[in-house]
Amino acid sequence: MSKVIQKKNHWTSRVHECTVKRGPQGELGVTVLGGAEHGEFPYVGAVAAVEAAGLPGGGEGPRLGEGELLLEVQGVRVSGLPRYDVLGVIDSCKEAVTFKAVRQGGRLNKDLRHFLNQRFQKGSPDHELQQTIRDNLYRHAVPCTTRSPREGEVPGVDYNFLTVKEFLDLEQSGTLLEVGTYEGNYYGTPKPPSQPVSGKVITTDALHSLQSGSKQSTPKRTKSYNDMQNAGIVHAENEEEDDVPEMNSSFTADSGEQEEHTLQETALPPVNSSIIAAPITDPSQKFPQYLPLSAEDNLGPLPENWEMAYTENGEVYFIDHNTKTTSWLDPRCLNKQQKPLEECEDDEGVHTEELDSELELPAGWEKIEDPVYGIYYVDHINRKTQYENPVLEAKRKKQLEQQQQQQQQQQQQQQQQQQQQTEEWTEDHSALVPPVIPNHPPSNPEPAREVPLQGKPFFTRNPSELKGKFIHTKLRKSSRGFGFTVVGGDEPDEFLQIKSLVLDGPAALDGKMETGDVIVSVNDTCVLGHTHAQVVKIFQSIPIGASVDLELCRGYPLPFDPDDPNTSLVTSVAILDKEPIIVNGQETYDSPASHSSKTGKVNGMKDARPSSPADVASNSSHGYPNDTVSLASSIATQPELITVHIVKGPMGFGFTIADSPGGGGQRVKQIVDSPRCRGLKEGDLIVEVNKKNVQALTHNQVVDMLVECPKGSEVTLLVQRGGLPVPKKSPKSQPLERKDSQNSSQHSVSSHRSLHTASPSHSTQVLPEFPPAEAQAPDQTDSSGQKKPDPFKIWAQSRSMYENRPMSPSPASGLSKGEREREINSTNFGECPIPDYQEQDIFLWRKETGFGFRILGGNEPGEPIYIGHIVPLGAADTDGRLRSGDELICVDGTPVIGKSHQLVVQLMQQAAKQGHVNLTVRRKVVFAVPKTENEVPSPASSHHSSNQPASLTEEKRTPQGSQNSLNTVSSGSGSTSGIGSGGGGGSGVVSTVVQPYDVEIRRGENEGFGFVIVSSVSRPEAGTTFAGNACVAMPHKIGRIIEGSPADRCGKLKVGDRILAVNGCSITNKSHSDIVNLIKEAGNTVTLRIIPGDESSNATLLTNAEKIATITTTHTPSQQGTQETRNTTKPKQESQFEFKAPQATQEQDFYTVELERGAKGFGFSLRGGREYNMDLYVLRLAEDGPAERCGKMRIGDEILEINGETTKNMKHSRAIELIKNGGRRVRLFLKRGDGSVPEYDPSSDRHGPATGPQGVPEVRAGPDRRQHPSLESSYPPDLHKSSPHGEKRAHARDPKGSREYSRQPNEHHTWNGTSRKPDSGACRPKDRAPEGRRDAQAERAAAANGPKRRSPEKRREGTRSADNTLERREKHEKRRDVSPERRRERSPTRRRDGSPSRRRRSLERLLEQRRSPERRRGGSPERRAKSTDRRRARSPERRRERSLDKRNREDRASHREREEANLKQDAGRSSRHPPEQRRRPYKECSTDLSI
């Protein structure tokens, strides 16, 4: 599509034809007036009445109107002809005459001067009419000029050559219809003579032949005159003629009639578009300027899908329908080369005098003679004005460059001569020391680079003169452009260079282009000397999807100082307010320390810029865009990639790095050596180091990479500048993040020896302002001798929730305490107790095993959906960005907030079919933790405390992944980054606002305190602990507050608050049961030390590693039945509540033991396994057993290897099998714990409901006595011969679990006294950990609180968690010594949900037991499980026989009356103790093995 848009009211729409017949006497009845000899169009005068009345003498068709302009008469174009020629044409017609006329308007009236002084687009009807007028004028008139005749020109035929005075006199007399200047010479078109020169007019046939194409009788005009005629083009035919003001020339200062005659045709030798002095000229008038065109030349049709249109002011522009863009530039002229300024000569290259007025102006320039401002020059391409002739200016600059080059060559010759003299002198005096001459600057092998030191950047149009590395690349244009921005080209003698690369753009992905590269050629077209706009338009003209071949030259700095504030005028559309940098290893200019003699010259570079800021401001005042145009198609918010070259000095690179607060890698923390780091800015994100991507590397890995660089070597950094700020609560805005490593340790790169360690005492010596590199000298050594951080710690930390600390500088991070506080406050992390959140998009490719994570939550309306367990080595784990506990916001763009769990599963299934998924997750950014004085720095920090050497043995655990390393929290290992969790735990955040406070709660005699404590243990990675490692440093929190309770009435407790101490005793490292004991011993008043937490991680968000217990009972301070083994083997020391980190002990290490099997086994029992989402721990040590006698093993130690096989992801049954199959010996590799064994929450078992841990309800220490599966199935040595999976199938062999089968003879008895029931899944552990026992008084008090009846699923979840409460465990301990009646009341049959038949059997059994204590013992599962001696005393056959006989007798002897009475009595008890709902069988109920 190539067309010109015109408005309907253009004069061409009013043109009409009229045929007028002559009258009987031959009269026509039409009077013609005007004519070119009067400076007018021929127009209609008086019209005869007969013609107007339409009588026989009238005409046919539309009538002629008086005053209408005559354009054609009998097919002859008469515009510009004198009146006598028009009358001659009319007289030649015999009967009828056909006229083509148009009514006069504001633009087209009878004044020829007015119409000729306007400028129109070539090819438009107005332009064609102008050409017709000129052609007709030249038939009778000869143009005149003030320039001298040239060879071959005939005066009076080609031109009338006049002096300037004669020309001005002629103009003043009104003889000239057109007046203009070209190259300083006046040109004019006079009126035709009022009478024919020879007395004869031109015949109609002659006019027809001339207008049909033959122009032999028309004098051939020279190039200058044709260019003068075609110079200025104004696009006004689309305007309403009555509203358009007249457009006058600026040739004269008069505002009268003579001003109308002056012309602006001055300008461009080359074109049909461009220059007039009127301010409406626009860039569309500048492009057909590249090649000289005659008046008859035609640029041809527009390209396909291009369209020509006009603005309201008549300015032409072009529409590209391919890209839906508009341009001022004619696409037909883009590839035409512009003539350089210094090569311009005067008109036709002939000089008569060396005058400015005789110099040829370059394309796009115009000379204006103004009576007020004098003579000045307008650059219509770049929209600027200047007083100096641009040609003379360019020539002077060229001469200056040549002089500079000559001077430089002379200097080089002198230097070479001096060098030769030096060599000769050295040869003659070889025995002497070298002379002082080497102090003289050596010869420079690259003279081009020394040009800027002379005050002018080097420039050349010859690619062979470039000194540097040539790079060839091919880029394909995307929908966003080529992905780079360009600076330079403000002047024709300025390089066009790469300013920056757009992230993920074609240029950045190609990897060859760098900042500062000079663009030499585009598609084999040399662009050296092209203006900025020209090159940009070349790139823009390339269609999307097409490729472009680029030749670049590397080795020239950008032509401005990046520190110069004036350079902000040269900005990029794509990258807002970004300062270009000087890169590519230009140490000659970058390092004033080593080149101090050149500093002044370098700094003076900005003063030598050919374009002053005023010029740039002038450009923008004309309405042009900034000089730097984006090639990225307006990516306004994208960051930019910048290449920086830095040479490592004696003190390092001169900058420090730290983890990015928003994740994604390492950022430049501080610039220490500004001259060395020129081009680098604080806050830059390091993307690549020496072409290697480091975004996915940890802090220490990046540091090690920089440390390994030798001194004096050059490092190429690709940094990302700009983009999005530190995330707060804004929506997802981090598409550029690669990894969310959120520890905020920082690292000094200014000294490679200070990279390793720094003690906290030294950290306070760092100055708050920019310190010199020497200030870090005290930190260069580590008293521990550790040179590099433990890689296992780094790996484990990067895979755990512990690193979720975006703004947590370690004490040794190089900042003083005050600095850290200011740093936190500056990011608003210390201003409010409620942490901010950060959203992140994570794209995952599906593996064969799936995406590698689990989904939790969404089971109730409004319940959030969270990321659960991350499958090791799965897709999510490999990617490294997704974390357990992240809240799921969107799945493939579909919001899932408030949606159901099922919907998310469906979305993930759809994503699985596609093979990839895009997740939007939200995680908490920070959790403020109080700063401790003796805090040990986190190993995630770049500095390590000298008093806490990390165990190198821990490297052996690298394959174990994050699972086992996370369990070191309770053992105080240095591998954790928790706070106060052990010797290695370091505080991450300093807060001046969030401080702990004491809460005192008083309860009545008959009520509990009314709050639920939730403890996080073992696996914070699998939970939803949004507070990062707060769950490790402060594992105990408020999970629920009972409405109306003392805790609720005090008003100071909130769900999510972390508990630091109970009654002044720190509970950071205490087990859940110890805390319960402390509260029970407190009596009616308890004092809690609290730090504000968050309500999002409350009891409804319990994790796989959390257990809960309700402190709502009316218990007394008395406590009974504690387990001696647990207390006597605890190695840990309780820390004081000053919240100092517990000191590291010598036991916090790894060790190996070999045990030989004794008479009763190896003498220890296990807890945990993969099926329970736990690691394996030592649960008990048998008295005087092999494990106890070895002296190394302790309760709570984590088992890492069994007989050389790692326990990572090992099932409990597999561990048993390994130990059994090992023969008489077993070799264990263990990790020292703190004496406490992590509790297991059965509700988190993967065999439970799909809801996972989110479905765990509150568990109160109420009357629900029915026990759930034990995690501690401790087998005697003589029963180890059973199947390794026998504990899973034990319920199938249980006689009590089935009413149809009698007891099996091979039933397994455990120390816990479990009797498995398939119908209920309940296993009755009798011997349990001390925290599992309860006293009777606490149980009765809990019954008064009246737990509500739950559904079977809820009750099943609740009872699993209930067995973790201290009261229940104590109750089991006391069952050994209570009376048969008490045991009878706790019979599991009484706790069942009572259907009549079930209650009937339970009642009959109860009556039979009352009749016979001996049988009562035989029928009690508790008694059977108490000890192996009793199990041996009663054979399975005897127990089976007795139970069957008793059941038969009970069925026969029972009476309905007695049964109903007993049922009523049972119902009365049920009102006090609600019956338990029947549960489904629970698999793998026994997971602990006594070995």
Swiss-Prot record:
Residues 236-267, 411-462, 586-623, 720-832, 932-987, 1112-1143, 1234-1491 are annotated as: Disordered. It is a peripheral membrane protein. The keyword Ligase does not apply. Gene3D superfamilies: 2.20.70.10, 2.30.42.10, Guanylate Kinase phosphate binding domain. PROSITE patterns: GUANYLATE_KINASE_1, GUANYLATE_KINASE_2, PDZ, WW_DOMAIN_1, WW_DOMAIN_2. Residues 435-445 have a biased composition (Pro residues). It is found in: Cell junction, Tight junction; Cell membrane. Keywords: ATP-binding, Cell junction, Cell membrane, Membrane, Nucleotide-binding, Phosphoprotein, Repeat, Tight junction. CDD domains: PDZ1_MAGI-1_3-like (cd06731), PDZ2_MAGI-1_3-like (cd06732), PDZ3_MAGI-1_3-like (cd06733), PDZ4_MAGI-1_3-like (cd06734), PDZ5_MAGI-1_3-like (cd06735), WW (cd00201). Residues 1278-1338, 1354-1396, 1403-1491 have a biased composition (Basic and acidic residues). Residues 975-987 have a biased composition (Gly residues). Residues 17-105, 472-554, 643-721, 813-895, 970-1066, 1124-1206 form the PDZ domain. GO terms for cellular component: adherens junction; bicellular tight junction; cell junction; cell periphery; cell projection; cell-cell junction; cytoplasm; nucleolus. Residues 411-421, 742-752 have a biased composition (Low complexity). Residues 970-1066 are annotated as: Interaction with FCHSD2. One of its GO terms (molecular function) is alpha-actinin binding. Widely expressed with the exception of skeletal muscle. Isoform 1, isoform 2 and isoform 6 are highly expressed in colon, kidney, lung, liver, and pancreas. Isoform 5 is predominantly expressed in brain and heart. Isoform 3 and isoform 4 are highly expressed in pancreas and brain. InterPro entries: GK/Ca_channel_bsu, Guanylate_kin-like_dom, Guanylate_kinase_CS, P-loop_NTPase, PDZ, PDZ_sf, WW_dom, WW_dom_sf. ATP binds at R103, Q104, G105, G106, R107, L108, N109, K110. The modification Phosphoserine is found at S357, S730, S741, S800, S1071, S1361, S1412. Residues 300-333, 359-392 form the WW domain. Residues 586-600, 756-766, 939-951, 1112-1130 have a biased composition (Polar residues). GO terms for biological process: cell adhesion; cell surface receptor signaling pathway; endothelial cell morphogenesis; positive regulation of cell-cell adhesion; protein-containing complex assembly; signal transduction. Plays a role in coupling actin fibers to cell junctions in endothelial cells, via its interaction with AMOTL2 and CDH5. May regulate acid-induced ASIC3 currents by modulating its expression at the cell surface. This is Membrane-associated guanylate kinase, WW and PDZ domain-containing protein 1. It comes from Homo sapiens.
